[in-house]
């Protein structure tokens, strides 16, 4: 596995050298930053709900969105979805997720084949027995015809059973057999690489192929992608499948992908969270962004630093203010990205007592240190390391929000550019 040192912001890290792939104009791999993507959970045949969810995911920051294409009605809806999104100003690339009958759907619906930016193929269910290679080739030939990239996406839950059985039998015949887990990992990697080689033999360029090998256990994911990275230079899509709900899914995905990303492995990521009933699908986009930003690989939104609280901070004022500021930033980012270039790098601190509050606030671009229990009820505000104001009274939160807005305008706004 070859690597080069790439520096995004102030955090250099060894980045595995992969072949860049253009997905609807978004570059995955090569020297491009790690791309955030997501997937809808709507019925794709329902154009209205799918358009609404894709638009929400795109507004949240998803740079590629995958949609299910599982039947004729779904395939027929894809060009309508693409057209509607473009009218709404959402030019996000759409990826078609195909299983079992993708070859037939692409052949029967050429407008769908044209509207999609990428096709996802699962080697484990693209076809069975003597039909497998033919149906895989049909999709690859469609990709060549329409000049589209493909993701060869292996999933341990639908792994090619013939390949797995062959490797299990071969392993059993050897004197010092590997564990069943090791054979499973090898089968996943081989399935991806064999399929990629076949696609290239058919005529699809390596700059049109992305690989993924998804499992549900953290150590398996680390092992499988390390093997893939060592044995190919294809662009890699990272994702922990069936990660779960809530904090479990967030922690598992972040643990696995954080280790791989730190090693320079991974060109695009998706955080696969099981949404709670009525939950917000865009949560997975936010988590992916925060993972990359926390590790210093990309910047998406200003991050608010806030202390966790202790016995000195019995008041909830600083917690409420930190939440308000973070929510306000998230809500305004679609506008701010256009109006204030570079605002993603802003750092804000909302601290709760005198112990670390002033110091942390000085380290941020703009910070506030609220009083802890028994401390003087005055609130110093620091801008670029210097104390600029002391707030008092019931309007502290509103006053600080205005100061943050003014700081953004003065530092990142048009007036600053004209003055310079």
Curated annotation (Swiss-Prot):
Pathway: Isoprenoid biosynthesis; isopentenyl diphosphate biosynthesis via DXP pathway; isopentenyl diphosphate from 1-deoxy-D-xylulose 5-phosphate: step 5/6
Gene Ontology BP term (one): isopentenyl diphosphate biosynthetic process, methylerythritol 4-phosphate pathway
Molecular-function GO terms, alphabetical: 4 iron, 4 sulfur cluster binding; 4-hydroxy-3-methylbut-2-en-1-yl diphosphate synthase activity (ferredoxin); 4-hydroxy-3-methylbut-2-enyl-diphosphate synthase activity (flavodoxin); iron ion binding
Essential cofactor(s): [4Fe-4S] cluster
EC number(s) given by UniProt: 1.17.7.3
Catalyzed reactions: (2E)-4-hydroxy-3-methylbut-2-enyl diphosphate + oxidized [flavodoxin] + H2O + 2 H(+) = 2-C-methyl-D-erythritol 2,4-cyclic diphosphate + reduced [flavodoxin]
Keywords, comma-separated and alphabetical: 4Fe-4S, Iron, Iron-sulfur, Isoprene biosynthesis, Metal-binding, Oxidoreductase
Family: Belongs to the IspG family.
Name of the protein this chain belongs to: 4-hydroxy-3-methylbut-2-en-1-yl diphosphate synthase (flavodoxin)
Protein source organism: Brucella canis (strain ATCC 23365 / NCTC 10854 / RM-666)
Taxonomic lineage of the native organism: Bacteria, Pseudomonadati, Pseudomonadota, Alphaproteobacteria, Hyphomicrobiales
